[in-house]
Amino acid sequence: MTMADFDWKARFGPIIDELEKDGLEHWATQLQQQLTHRFEDRPHGDLDRWQAALDQLPGLTQIDAQLDQSAVTLTSRQPLTVAQREQLELGLRGLMPWRKGPFDFFGTYIDTEWHSDWKWDRVSPYLSDLSGRRILDVGCGSGYHCWRMLGEGAGRVIGIDPGLLFLFQFFSVKDYLGDVPIDLLPVRMEALPADLETFDTTFSMGVLYHQRSPLDHLLELKGTLRRGGELVLETLVVEGPEGFSLMPEDRYGQMRNVWFLPSCDTLLRWLDRTGFRNARVVDVTPTTTDEQRSTDWMRFNSLQDFLDPNDPSKTVEGYPGPLRATVIAEKP
């Protein structure tokens, strides 16, 4: 197995061609340069191992997908043999840890660290109808929510996330489904051209608090949307008045890259100042150890290890425990 076994040009050639045909030549050119750098100039040392795990997955036919259920579910009208089930398990285990999900591959249930379906259930009642919409999902992880968007009738879904293990987990689903209008690009938000103004809905869930400049992130998100487009923003918040924002001294819940946790009123002010309209908080929910926890598919530390063992309402650093708000707003 060599690095050449991962053919990034074959993987991403179709979406690069599509962007060119859609009049987004500047994005297509920039993306090709970024992917060349990612996979040729500085290839990740685990690419061959992850490709080997994908290659382990059995080839199956007569496949159906249920994308409107809690678990993104693949089924086959052709029953799997014992050997195929063993291959499937080995391949999927080779892509551990699985953090975002859950997924069900032909009866093999992947109980991921996060119950991402709970977040979807909180957000989805407040969304504009996704039917036919072109959607961007920023920080999409392995693409769980992208699949749920497709299940709601989205016309085109593009997820972006720099994590390459997430990319291969995404491939494990897409390779079974073939030509479906969904792609995951292994890039960061700042790698997108400014002012694309091409998406009907842009999601940014669990990203804002990782930004050193949250207002710049909001402006970047606004630039992805067409006029009248919808932003769906989910982030960590704290209780407090308008103008208040918590900046951790160092870590928050053992995470180093957490910068700003605003109050809900502060978050609404940020959206107003960055030019969004009709911003409203639609949900505020504490994250519990039922929603985020270690499992057989993610065996590392999880939320219970990041909370004060004597007071689970606080992080181990003494800050308020994780509280997540979802805000929806429009671009004028």
List the model feature ranges, each with a label:
Residues 200-214:
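A short SAM/SAH-binding and catalytic strip from SAM-dependent methyltransferases
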Residues 133-141:
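Conserved class I S-adenosyl-L-methionine
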Residues 1-116, 175, 247-249, 268, ...:
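N-terminal accessory regions of S-adenosyl-L-methionine
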Residues 192-202:
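A short acidic, Gly/Pro-enriched loop at the edge of an enzyme's catalytic core
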Residues 259-275:
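Short alpha-helix
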